[in-house]
Every structure is written in structure tokens, then in C-alpha cells.
Amino acid sequence: MIHNEEEQLEKKIEKNQDPKINHKKYDSDNLIKKNLIQFLEIQLKESEEKIIEKEEIVEKEIVLIHNRFNKEIEKSIKFSLEKIIIDFLPIIDNIERALNLIETINLKQEKYTEILKKLQFICNLLEKFFYLFNIKKINDTNVLFNPSIHQAMSIHYTNDIISNQIVTVMQSGYILHKSRLLRPAMVVVSKEKI
């Protein structure tokens, strides 16, 4: 009997409910869900695009860092000899001075000719060393003075030579790999007499 009463009560409730109201509620819930899904899909797409952009930026930065690192390594290797060569330059200068002294004095004694041969041999080895490691000697005369590779030590006033020419090289200069000045050449520069 109780069971019957419950069934009757349920039927009454169903009859009293308006199906349009129930349907509207369902439609509204569906609309909210659809809107939420669309919103979440848009956010997901935007997030994916941002992630892709950031990945591209990170990849570019990694390539830049890699290239910069490789350039630094190349530069370090290329110019690793710089300090050693700079310290070695006074020794080279002294060998050249000794060679020039013996040649200018023109000593004919056997011991001096033997020293001269050995000094010339050392100079030839140094030239090969310079060539091997791309070191250029700056010792040209009758060229225009270039302040980036020459240091003027004196001025020679004359009308025989064009002004601003290298007349004499007092001390050779050196360039490493055509770009790094190890030491400027100490030179005498010509200037017109007034």
C-alpha cells in the first residue's frame, strides 16, 4: 500500500512539471558546457601556440649561444700564441741586431762567419715559424705611414721623398692573423722641408 502511494505521488509530480522548463534547464546546462568547452579549447590552443613560440625562441638562443661559444673557442685557439710571441719578440730583435752588426762590420774571420751562418739559420727558422702561425712582420720602407700599425719615433725632413712615407724602420712590428697587432713598427717618417 505504501508502495502504491509513492507511485501515485510520483505520477502527480511528473504531471505537474512543465516539460518546457525541464528542457530549458537541460539546454542551458548544455550551452554552459559548450561555452566552457570552447573557452577551454581556445585557451589550450593559445597555450600551445605560446609553447611553440617559446620553443622556437629557446632553439634560436641555443643556436646563438652555440655559435658564440664556437667563435670564442676559435678566437682562443687562433690567438693563443699571442702572449708567448710578444714575450719572444725581444729575443728576435736581439738576434736580428746581432746579425745586422756582423753583416755591417763585415768581419772576415772564420769564427764570425760561422756565427753569421748560425744566426741566418735561426732567422730562417723564425721566418718559417712566422709563416706557419700566420705572423706578418711589419718592416717595409717607402710605404705610407699607417698609424694603426706604425709608431712614428722621428721625423726626417726632406724634399726627396713624398711626405708621410716610412724612411727607416727602427724596430719591426708584428701582426698576428692579419687582424691582431702584436707590436707596432717603430719608424722614421718623412716630411717636406718648408
Swiss-Prot record:
GO process terms (BP): protein folding
**Which residues does the annotated region (Disordered) include?**
1-22
* Location of this chain's protein in the cell: Cytoplasm
Q: Does the keyword Cytoplasm apply?
A: yes
Q: Print the keywords alphabetically.
A: Chaperone, Cytoplasm, Stress response
Question: Which Gene Ontology molecular-function terms are recorded?
Answer: adenyl-nucleotide exchange factor activity; protein homodimerization activity; protein-folding chaperone binding; unfolded protein binding
Per its UniProt entry, which superkingdom is the organism in? Bacteria
Q: Which SUPFAM superfamilies match?
A: Coiled-coil domain of nucleotide exchange factor GrpE (SSF58014), Head domain of nucleotide exchange factor GrpE (SSF51064)
Q: Name one GO cellular component term.
A: cytoplasm
The answer to whether the entry has keyword Chaperone is yes
- What binding partners and quaternary form does the record give? Homodimer.
Q: What is the role of this chain? A: Participates actively in the response to hyperosmotic and heat shock by preventing the aggregation of stress-denatured proteins, in association with DnaK and GrpE. It is the nucleotide exchange factor for DnaK and may function as a thermosensor. Unfolded proteins bind initially to DnaJ; upon interaction with the DnaJ-bound protein, DnaK hydrolyzes its bound ATP, resulting in the formation of a stable complex. GrpE releases ADP from DnaK; ATP binding to DnaK triggers the release of the substrate protein, thus completing the reaction cycle.
**Homology family:** Belongs to the GrpE family.
Which protein is depicted? Answer: Protein GrpE 1
- Which organism is this entry from? Buchnera aphidicola subsp. Acyrthosiphon pisum (strain APS) (Acyrthosiphon pisum symbiotic bacterium)
